[in-house]
């Protein structure tokens, strides 16, 4: 379950790191909607050693792809063939060349009394969403993407 927390644009990562240090559970999400971008930072707490966190950006990007393209069990946003991953963790669009940035994915690790956590930050370009015809309310889109990232981070890290 995703716990949505609206914050001032530009403070998403700080809010997630602070919440992670204070013991917030996996699924806590700080998000903001700006004119040019939609940004969220999601707390994940995979049950691995910190040295395994290096794979988390790619896993987060795969979660984003599941939500954008769909899987066998969920329809996604219907963007199959329209989006892809640019190594190692950015989401791009603009088939067939895939040269337009849709989202940048970054991960920051942290630790506190509650244990290790990752703050997965995703910055989504509104212009690319428009080009792809994505017409979903901001909070609903963030919640959908964050849930997919959280699900894969618990399975594949």
What residue spans do the PLM features occupy?
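Short amphipathic C-terminal alpha-helix that caps PH/PH-like domains
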Residues: 61, 137-153
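Catalytic palm active-site di-aspartate
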Residues: 76-99, 104, 124-125
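Short coil/turn connectors at secondary-structure junctions
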Residues: 24-25, 79-80, 112-117
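Short, acidic (Asp/Glu-rich) active-site segment that either coordinates a divalent metal cofactor
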Residues: 106-140
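Beta-hairpin (beta-strand-turn-beta-strand) motif
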Residues: 43-47, 88, 108, 123-125
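Conserved small/polar residues in nucleotide/adenosyl-binding loops
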Residues: 155-157
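N-terminal lobe of the biotin/lipoate ligase/transferase fold
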Residues: 1-78, 93-99
């Amino acid at each position: 379950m995703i716990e949505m927390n609206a914050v001032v644009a530009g403070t998403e990562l700080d809010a997630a790191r602070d919440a992670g240090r204070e013991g917030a559970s996996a699924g806590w999400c700080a998000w903001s909607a700006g004119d040019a971008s939609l940004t969220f930072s999601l707390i994940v707490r995979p049950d691995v050693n910190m040295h395994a966190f290096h794979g988390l950006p790619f896993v987060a990007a795969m979660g984003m792809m599941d939500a954008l393209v769909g899987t066998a069990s969920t329809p996604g946003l219907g963007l199959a063939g329209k989006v892809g991953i640019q190594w190692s963790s950015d989401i791009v669009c603009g088939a067939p060349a895939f040269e337009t940035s849709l989202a940048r994915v970054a991960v920051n690790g942290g630790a506190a009394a509650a244990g290790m956590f990752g703050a997965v930050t995703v910055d989504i370009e509104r212009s690319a969403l428009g080009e792809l015809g994505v017409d979903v309310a901001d909070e609903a889109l963030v919640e959908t993407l964050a849930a997919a990232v959280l699900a894969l981070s618990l399975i594949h890290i």
